[in-house]
From Swiss-Prot:
Pfam families with a match to the protein in the record: BTB, zf-C2H2
Official protein name in the record: Zinc finger and BTB domain-containing protein 7A
Subcellular location: Nucleus
Superkingdom in the source lineage: Eukaryota
Biased composition regions of type Low complexity, renumbered to the chain: 534-546
Underlying gene: ZBTB7A
CDD domains associated with the record: BTB_POZ_ZBTB7A
Predominant location category: nucleus
UniProt GO MF annotations: DNA binding; DNA-binding transcription factor activity; DNA-binding transcription factor activity, RNA polymerase II-specific; transcription corepressor binding; zinc ion binding
Domain spans labelled BTB: 34-101
Assigned GO CC terms: nucleus
General function of this protein: Transcription factor that represses the transcription of a wide range of genes involved in cell proliferation and differentiation. Directly and specifically binds to the consensus sequence 5'-[GA][CA]GACCCCCCCCC-3' and represses transcription both by regulating the organization of chromatin and through the direct recruitment of transcription factors to gene regulatory regions. May also play a role, independently of its transcriptional activity, in double-strand break repair via classical non-homologous end joining/cNHEJ and in alternative splicing.
Zinc fingers (C2H2-type) by residue: 359-381, 387-409, 415-437, 443-467
Keywords per UniProt: DNA-binding, Metal-binding, Nucleus, Repeat, Transcription, Transcription regulation, Zinc, Zinc-finger
Amino acid sequence: MAGGVDGPIGIPFPDHSSDILSSLNEQRNNGLLCDVVILVEGQEFPTHRSVLAACSQYFKKLFTSGLVVDQQNVYEIDFVSADALSALLEFAYTATLTVSTSNVNDILNAAKLLEIPAVRDVCTDLLDRKILAKNDQMDLVDQIDQRNHLRAKEYLEFFQSNPVNGHQGSFPWTNPELRDLQRLNFRGQEDEEEPDCNGLDFYSQAPLNERPKANDCDPDSNPAMWLDREEEEAAAAPGSLFSPSQNGHYSGRGLGTPGEEEGAPGAALDQQDAGDSPSFVPTGAEAEDDARDVDGLAASVLQQVMGSVGRQQLGDDERKDDDGVVDYYLKYFGSSNESDVYPSWSQKVEKKIRAKAFQKCPICAKVIQGAGKLPRHIRTHTGEKPYECNICNVRFTRQDKLKVHMRKHTGEKPYLCQQCGAAFAHNYDLKNHMRVHTGLRPYQCDSCFKTFVRSDHLHRHLKKDGCNGIPSRRGRRPRVRDAGGLPTPTGNPEDGGFQGGGESQESEDTVQGNGREQHFEESSTAEAAGLNVAGGAAEGSAPGPS
């Protein structure tokens, strides 16, 4: 192919990453395709483990410990607050962190424990410059809760030191305080017997003599959900659990209510007796019917849980007060010190992640689409220009503008014409240049119908040439198809005289006659300026037609 390019061509899609992130956030809010639930202070946060692992090094180490079939679907952590985790999840899915004076300390501690350096640096900088922190809270900013730090460390070390997660009863606790805690994040305490079971507590795989009964449930703990491969084949047996890899379809013995279990048809043995008997194996028909009922029940229960959590989070977000956010922006951007206007963390590389979320400007109440666009809009009110050229010290409000500006110093011309090989520093220059090859002249004067390649040429034509509704006679010449048809100048060119008055009149008639035709633009700006000067001199020296 003539003029083509050999080899592969990379075609970028700038909005692809923001679309993916927006879709993941929509799935999280609706409880769709979430493969892990984080339980904090009784609140459930369904999310995607891949998103958490990409954002937090702590979750990455937690989720990658052990085999895939031995991973949990529910993790209960008590070393961070629910509000802090909610803010961090919003940051992971929307690239926007919402902080206020009331929760900045909790978010900072959670970011340190979960190893999220971006949030940690921002909160630390805000607290160091006293933008959000109060005077009576400064002594709490510089220290992390050591108890929560030990809990997070031991919680992670437990999964890393037990990759199979099959024998967790003899875990060597290094902290005696944690060993005596009533609420632990994993199976390290005695199970409290409770007659009623809601079917949402999952037990880890333990020896047969230590397994909880089918109607035992501990509401204050969230044990692990591991299963040996051998028991996956007999998942319908009492006391066993389905593999967590089966999309949340767990055994019906742990999901059914006592009333349903007593009245279940075809039950040959009592559930508790059957759970205590290792040799009990149901018949094929009973196991098939029981498994079918269990799958439907488990799927409906989990779907209701995910939906209720999503609706609860949406309702909480709608009821959230915006006063903290407004105070944050007003305090942050209202500072007169240069160190406050240009913080160090704001000069880092901005990620072009623009989640399609609607946010309202706290200053002018304008609704901004895109999570990453609100800080950029705020700079229009404050005049902040955090991005500075290290060569000429020119400042910019956006990083992409600084990147384009640097091409003036480096001479970089990344935009290449595939037809003639000409290189340009800006994309719009290449776009205008391509019209030379295509012949496209999209800008037309409404008065004289002259067409132009660029909009600034049309603007110059309207402003300087004085096109006021009739075809202009200054600074233009008629479109001539043959070189012999051009008028021959005579005498001094500065006088503007042409050979014979008839040819001059004929030239003017030609201009008026071709007023509605498309004319070729002058080859250069200097040539156009020369024509304007010559035309002005000719019109000024020669008397006009009577």
